[in-house]
Amino acid sequence: VSRLDGYGRLDRSRTLTFTFDGATFTGHPGDTLASALLASGVHAVATSVTLGRPRGIAAAWSEDPSGLVQVEEPFPEPMLLASTIELTDGLVARGLPGRGRLAEVPDTARYDRRYTHCGLLVVGAGPAGLLAARTAARRGERVVLVDDRPAAGGTLLGTERIAGRSALDFVADTVVELRSYPDVLHLQRTTAFGHYDDGFVLALQRRTDHLGTDAPRNVSRQRVHRIRAAQVVVATGAHERPIVFEDNDR
């Protein structure tokens, strides 16, 4: 296994076992499927649709353009990015030859929705999003903060210091402060996927996917939040895009 000792937000005291393309590998809580595969020396995870060229992991989260996989267990789901799948014990997945396959068995999981009204909705819990949410909360506003990653922080999770102090301490202290306000709703693993007229935003929260087979049956797997906000701050950051040229995938 290829890993750097002392780096990464992993629980190295626990080992998770998963299967990819029929082979068994191990990882740790805090891994994504992509990071666990890379640590195990697996670089090609899929193939292109037309020419069958190998596709690997090109980015660390949803900006990855090519690491598409098919999850078979705990429930079949196609066309997911390996970089966004949190590793769970017993996960079974395989690389995609361009197209996925829908589940052939009934989905027995629960799904629900919730309606929320707020003065300020902040999309993205990186440095700008955390500060925007904290500033509004200190003014007494009703705030909703959503972020699609497992933990808040964004680029701060890979930054040593901010404003003369530890970046991780800043994130932790800000999250604790936001949690102390009764009118602040902070949702991680929640993707805002639609922004419509009059401050209406739809967001999908993944509530139990990261728990794998340990997910409680009395909790919905996913929840759609229908949010009506007086103001919306989009603090999702930016990502570099690879240059397009002939054979740039070789």
PLM regions with names:
Residues 32-35:
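Short, structural beta-strand-to-alpha-helix junction motif
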Residues 43, 142, 183-185:
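Conserved beta-strand segments of alpha/beta enzyme cores
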Residues 50-60, 65, 71-73, 79-121, ...:
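FAD-binding core/adjacent interface of flavoenzyme oxidoreductases
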Residues 13, 113-115, 138:
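Short, flexible coil/linker segments at domain boundaries that flank nucleotide/cofactor-interacting
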Residues 30, 124-126, 237:
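A short acidic Gly-Thr/Ser loop motif
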Residues 27, 46-47, 145-147, 187-188, ...:
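General beta-strand structural signal in soluble alpha/beta enzymes
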Residues 118-180, 241-246:
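Beta1-alpha1 glycine-rich phosphate/pyrophosphate-binding loop at the start
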Residues 1-20, 26-29, 40-70:
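Ubiquitin-like/PB1-type beta-grasp interaction modules and other compact soluble beta-rich domains
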